[in-house]
Amino acid sequence: MAGLVYPQYPVFPGYRHPYRQHPPLYKPKQQYWKPPYKGAPGPLKPTNPLDCLDGYKWAQLKALLSQLGPEFGLGRRFTKEVGVQVNPRVDACIQCSLGPRTLKNCKAGSFLFHAAPGQHAGLGIIAPVRFPLTVAVYSRLSDRRLFTLPTFTNGGKKECETQMDPAEEDLVLNRPAFQFLEQKYGFFHCKNCQTRWESAYVWCVSGTNKVYFKQFCHKCQKGHNPYYVESIECKRCKKAWCSCPERRHIDLKRPHCQELCGRCKGQRLSCDKTYSFKYII
């Protein structure tokens, strides 16, 4: 009866009957609900999930697609490709190695690769970032160029303005800026209790006899800082293992005295009165 009384289309354009409701722009959908019992007919899921979006959410989706790129339209073939693929192996290494620092693109020898044309179009994704291997500072096989002193420039001028002799320049340039430690035998003398002792595994600067850690007397426990350690060698044959024809008796309980041959000759305290023990710092 309503269709007969009220015409479906207005007589005058732009004018509608005040009592007739405006037809909705989209067909309202019922909320998805679970049937209370088996076999009950329930509403089916729509074939197109985009039909469930209202006008506001649909406008938000179009705005997001427009931000990703102008070539992204509203077609279905683009909706499946919208996403960022994350490689956990690459991204985790970058996060752990760099931390909060930002990536800087170097002009020469850069390890940062830009995205190829057509690859991840519109997403602004770059290719995986590659970093050089970190050089261990405490390794003997590390690159010495990281620890060397400033060298000459292209113009032939030095970075330092002071002038030195050629012999001093060679000595300074050949000297490593980083010093390694090695273990040596140490021979010490305490002036407080007038006791001499010998210690093994003393940390010294590599290539020198300079002691790196403070030593403690085994008798009075007084700590002193010896700057140098005597080299363990025979004073007559200048060898670590004495090759002299006349050798004194070697005590098997104290084998370190065998390397101190000739050390107590002419000294107030003989090697028999020294105390030998080992300790590791």
From Swiss-Prot:
GO terms for biological process: negative regulation of translation; oogenesis; translation. It comes from the Eukaryota. A zinc finger (3CxxC-type) spans 183-267. One of its GO terms (cellular component) is cytoplasm. It is found in: Cytoplasm, Cytoplasmic ribonucleoprotein granule. Its main location: cytoplasm. The keyword Zinc-finger applies. Pfam families: Zn_ribbon_3CxxC. Expressed in oocytes. One of its GO terms (molecular function) is zinc ion binding. Keywords: Cytoplasm, Developmental protein, Differentiation, Metal-binding, Oogenesis, RNA-binding, Zinc, Zinc-finger. mRNA-binding protein required for maternal mRNA storage, translation and degradation during oocyte maturation. Controls timing of meiosis during oogenesis. Probably promotes formation of some phase-separated membraneless compartment that stores maternal mRNAs in oocytes: acts by undergoing liquid-liquid phase separation upon binding to maternal mRNAs. Binds to the 3'-UTR of maternal mRNAs, inhibiting their translation. Component of a cytoplasmic ribonucleoprotein complex together with eif4enif1/4E-T and cpeb1. Belongs to the ZAR1 family. Disordered regions undergo liquid-liquid phase separation (LLPS) for the formation of membraneless compartments that store maternal mRNAs in oocytes. The 3CxxC-type mediates binding to the 3'-UTR of mRNAs. This is Protein ZAR1-like 1.L. It comes from Xenopus laevis (African clawed frog).
